[in-house]
Amino acid sequence: MQHIRNFSIIAHIDHGKSTLADRLIHFCGGLSDREMEAQVLDSMDLERERGITIKAQTAALHYKAKDGQVYNLNLIDTPGHVDFSYEVSRSLSACEGALLVVDASQGVEAQTVANCYTAIEQNVEVVPVLNKIDLPAADPESARKEIEDVIGVDASEAVLCSAKTGLGIEDVLETVVRRVPPPKGDPDAPLKALIIDSWFDNYVGVVMLVRVVDGVLKPKDRILLMANGAQYPCDQVGVFTPRSVARPQLSAGEVGFIIAGIKELQAAKVGDTVTLAMRPASEPLPGFKEIKPQVFAGLYPVESSEYDQLRDSLEKLRLNDASLQYEPEVSQALGFGFRCGFLGLLHMDIVQERLEREFDMNLITTAPTVVYEVVMNSGEVIRVENPAKLPDQSKIAEIREPIITATIFLPQDYVGPVITLCNLKRGAQVDMRYHGRQVQLIYDLPMNEVVMDFFDKLKSVSRGYASLDYEFKEYRAADLVKLDLLVGGEKVDALSVIVHRASAQYRGREVAAKLRGLIPRQMFDVAIQSAIGSHIVARETIKALRKNVLAKCYGGDISRKKKLLEKQKEGKKRMKQVGNVEIPQEAFLAVLRVDEGK
């Protein structure tokens, strides 16, 4: 065990985690030159295209150090995006060390700080690595100073490397061997293994990625999952080098996989403890906190006949993504669909894209909303995640909205516009600190303002330089109202949103105007109205298309023309009573993108 080192790589998006992982794998001979490809550990097409890591991946490497010993290094690559921060905390709980990768030309950014604090909380040895030192803009000294100022980690021995050119990779490995402590654990104690991740494989069933803390596991052993008491025969154990390689056993301190013919992913919950049925451990390992979805949206198939297919697709996605939650719901406007819970907007975007890509679904998505706490007059508190389910205003004592604490890092040139943006979004400034050229702003912001379009706005006012990290703080009472949209006098439940009273009227006008341009003209007038309760705050009318019924009258008596016009008017009136208006998918998206910064 003295020769095992478990470490993960943490960094902000685009600071070069995955490239560094590639270099380390290549250097240790995990893959030959022919098999090597960029971002080996990002196995999803989507991860490659967007250049982000979504699922944590592992690789077991052999490294012959300068002291002549051969070390087993278990590398875990983690995501950097704020939506997937729970993936990071899971990966860190399996490690004794973490490489904190900082781009030498960019310095410290928001997720660097967040992930680093997660590591420090879990008592993981943090090893700073300054990457991209081959760039002309690299400034390792100021990056070093920022690490010490902002995070408070000693960076005097930070390793300088360039993952792209392979410069300094050996120094990184030597530092890992020297500074990361070997795992503690007792190979003779009863088996305890923590499930870090689990996913579904079509051939072998559920694959569990585990960190063995105590004991030894061999194929043919009967394993017991401590959360639900289920037992399974273990078929195969092994490690990823990133390819899966079977091993005769997994022992204390190692990170590897277990295949035990488990059919449903819900059985192998992440954070559960695996032990032996014959000789179980007395108590499970401390798991992870259950993650709660922050953002909800309705997903509906465009063709109602595809409802079952959507349900199957969501079930399959859930096999790989335990944080996705969904339940069936019915909308008068869109028919049958699902209310899905996501970790954040990026997560929602990715789930939607995977459904469209991997399962060929055509989807309509409603506006994302957050969970509100509604206090009724009776004193009862209910949670509302769908604006259409908000109780009648007369029964409500108060509505509380979720508040998040956002940490924003940005160059000081952009402080003005970013503060203006935060104030527009009803933010309250908590703190502001200067670190060299960088500024750290801390704001309390209402979550529903962030869900709408805060992230895109932040990027545009700071020219892409600002980075954001946020965490949930509390529920706070606010003056919120439900804004309904009526098309042709009918409420369209899927277009309802909960907004702050101060911006309700403005928003109602904006949405109505936007819908007017998107709903195609009909043969009759269509009124689009925004309403708060029974109070109409805005109205737009889509004018009817009409045929010129007088075209065939040449001269002749006026009464003949009047008769034709009256007949047309009657027809339009009748159409208006029975006609219904189809609302295109763009209209649902337009409600999200009502631009408040005009």
From Swiss-Prot:
Q: What is its EC number?
A: 3.6.5.n1
One MF annotation (Gene Ontology) recorded for this entry? GTPase activity
Its membrane topology is listed as: Peripheral membrane protein
Gene of this entry: lepA
Q: Which domain of life is it from?
A: Bacteria
Instruction: Name the job this protein performs.
Output: Required for accurate and efficient protein synthesis under certain stress conditions. May act as a fidelity factor of the translation reaction, by catalyzing a one-codon backward translocation of tRNAs on improperly translocated ribosomes. Back-translocation proceeds from a post-translocation (POST) complex to a pre-translocation (PRE) complex, thus giving elongation factor G a second chance to translocate the tRNAs correctly. Binds to ribosomes in a GTP-dependent manner.
Tell me the protein family, please. Belongs to the TRAFAC class translation factor GTPase superfamily. Classic translation factor GTPase family. LepA subfamily.
The record, for NCBIfam families, names: lepA, small_GTP
The GO biological-process annotations, alphabetized, read as:
positive regulation of translation
> InterPro entries per the record?
EF-4, EFG_III/V, EFG_V-like, EFTu-like_2, G_TR_CS, LepA_C_sf, LepA_CTD, LepA_IV
Q: Could you tell me what reaction this enzyme catalyses?
A: GTP + H2O = GDP + phosphate + H(+)
Protein name, as recorded: Elongation factor 4
Q: Where in the cell is it found?
A: Cell inner membrane
Q: Which Gene3D superfamilies match?
A: 3.30.70.240, Elongation factor 4, C-terminal domain (3.30.70.2570), Elongation Factor G (Translational Gtpase), domain 3 (3.30.70.870), P-loop containing nucleotide triphosphate hydrolases (3.40.50.300), Translation factors (2.40.30.10)
Provide the binding site for GTP. Answer: 14-19, 131-134
Q: Which organism is it from?
A: Aromatoleum aromaticum (strain DSM 19018 / LMG 30748 / EbN1) (Azoarcus sp. (strain EbN1))
Domain tr-type G residue range list:
2-184
Q: Which UniProt keywords apply?
A: Cell inner membrane, Cell membrane, GTP-binding, Hydrolase, Membrane, Nucleotide-binding, Protein biosynthesis
**Mind telling me which GO cellular component terms the entry cites?**
plasma membrane
